[in-house]
């Protein structure tokens, strides 16, 4: 519903951007023609293909599937309501994987067809002439990238002083610089106080910044202010399952709730709300139910922002280390010194590795640049395996690739890098 359709559209956006950038390399194309019906059809085809594949794998493994709306009746029973009937299922064990849904802002009429959520925006009913995105987090910026590439004039309003709160500022900077060129406006430290229908069409948005109020008109508004766990409307009040003050189901390292035979995984079980974390948790829960020794003990969970450039990080961020007074040292390699990135016409990236100053082991990695999401896995492996700077720098990486910037960053830390001139520290 979210990951695959959005990444399908982001791929289209990336190709369109790369096509445009080829002008700097002596290659030009006529203006691309965007068939929105064709784009929508392609996106739906990919989703259907993957969904049917999952159904076939379940059938091959003799997993019975029942389509319907499930609600708990007790700690050991659920009711499944489908179009034709209701049935009660008694279970020995249950795994709750109900996910999350888009958060809303009080006073913004989400029932208005021109007020979109990340889910309804992916339906691509139409491409608005101008679009305001409320929220400068990963969902808002990814959707802004998509709609900008499809022809919308995009603006973003973020309540906090910076885009992508939580990410290291040095990683966000290259993306912010590019988005300022692509987007019409980026309103920071801005509160949206109201969204009202305009005549004859569109929406009038009232904004507040530094105590001053202004109004702007947009064809559509996309609310992207985070997600909330789907713990309501599934009958949890009929059980003794504990929900914390943020609405998440409380689980232990085995993904078990306070009810011995009920487990919870994914967005409904707590942050970070990431599909790959949910998959890992699901495997843990399944193994525990089967009597195997398993628990969720991941030292590193990668996060990726699929904008252009992409941003990815894993482990401790530099901002987190500073905030929590965690001692660290780092090695950074600018992609302006990477032959592969220069050949691609993309020199804005950087790879950063954060090390424990005593053991020299990797405790965090941050990357910004094309394909950062594909590159971050090496960082996750380095953290999980306890790799130190020497382990990474002495591992031969293929040349010319973006992946070798990971080794280069470790070499910078070690003082052995040859792709950059860094004066030796005195003493």
Please state what every model-predicted region is.
Residues 1-4, 8-18, 290, 306-317, ...:
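Flexible, glycine-rich terminal cap/loop adjacent to redox cofactors
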Residues 1-127, 160-164, 170-173, 178-187, ...:
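Glycine-rich flavin
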Residues 30, 64-67, 71-84, 89, ...:
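A Rossmann-like FAD-binding core segment of flavoenzymes
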Residues 134-137, 167, 267:
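Glycine-rich Rossmann-fold phosphate-binding loop(s) that bind the pyrophosphate
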């Amino acid at each position: 519903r979210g990951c695959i359709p959005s990444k399908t559209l982001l791929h289209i956006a990336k190709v369109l951007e790369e096509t445009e950038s080829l002008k700097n390399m002596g290659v030009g194309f006529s203006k691309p023609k965007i068939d929105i019906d064709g784009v929508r059809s392609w996106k739906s085809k990919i989703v259907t293909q993957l969904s049917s594949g999952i159904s076939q794998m379940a059938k091959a493994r003799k997993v019975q599937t029942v389509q319907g709306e499930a609600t708990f009746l007790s700690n050991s029973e659920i009711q499944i309501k489908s179009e034709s009937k209701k049935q009660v299922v008694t279970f020995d064990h249950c795994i709750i994987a109900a996910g999350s849904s888009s958060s809303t802002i009080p006073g913004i009429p989400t029932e208005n067809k021109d007020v979109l959520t990340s889910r309804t925006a992916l339906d691509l009913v139409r491409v608005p002439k101008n679009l305001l995105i409320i929220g400068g987090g990963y969902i808002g910026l990814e959707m802004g990238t998509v709609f900008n590439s499809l022809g919308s004039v995009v603006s973003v309003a973020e309540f906090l002083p910076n885009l992508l709160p939580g990410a290291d500022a040095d990683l966000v900077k290259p993306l912010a610089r590019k988005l300022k060129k692509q987007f019409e406006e980026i309103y920071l430290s801005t509160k949206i106080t109201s969204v009202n229908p305009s005549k004859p069409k569109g929406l009038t948005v009232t904004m507040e910044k530094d105590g001053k109020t202004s109004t702007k008109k947009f064809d559509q508004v996309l609310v992207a202010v985070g997600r909330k766990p789907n713990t309501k409307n599934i009958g949890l009040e009929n059980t003794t399952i504990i929900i914390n003050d943020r609405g998440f189901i409380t689980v232990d390292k085995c993904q078990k709730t306070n009810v011995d035979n009920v487990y919870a995984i994914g967005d409904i079980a707590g942050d970070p709300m990431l599909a790959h974390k949910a998959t890992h948790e699901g495997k843990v829960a399944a193994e525990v139910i089967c009597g195997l020794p398993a628990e969720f003990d991941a030292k590193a969970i990668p996060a990726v922002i699929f904008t252009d450039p992409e941003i990815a990080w894993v482990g401790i961020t530099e901002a987190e280390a500073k905030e929590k007074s965690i001692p660290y040292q780092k090695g950074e390699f600018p992609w302006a010194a990477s032959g592969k990135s220069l050949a691609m016409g993309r020199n804005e990236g950087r790879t950063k590795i954060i090390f424990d100053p005593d053991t020299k082991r990797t405790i965090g990695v941050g990357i910004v640049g094309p394909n950062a999401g594909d590159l971050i896995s090496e960082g996750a492996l380095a953290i999980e395996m306890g790799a130190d700077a020497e382990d990474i720098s002495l591992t031969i990486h293929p040349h010319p690739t973006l992946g070798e910037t990971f080794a280069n960053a470790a070499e910078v830390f070690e003082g052995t890098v040859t792709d950059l001139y860094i004066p030796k520290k005195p003493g």
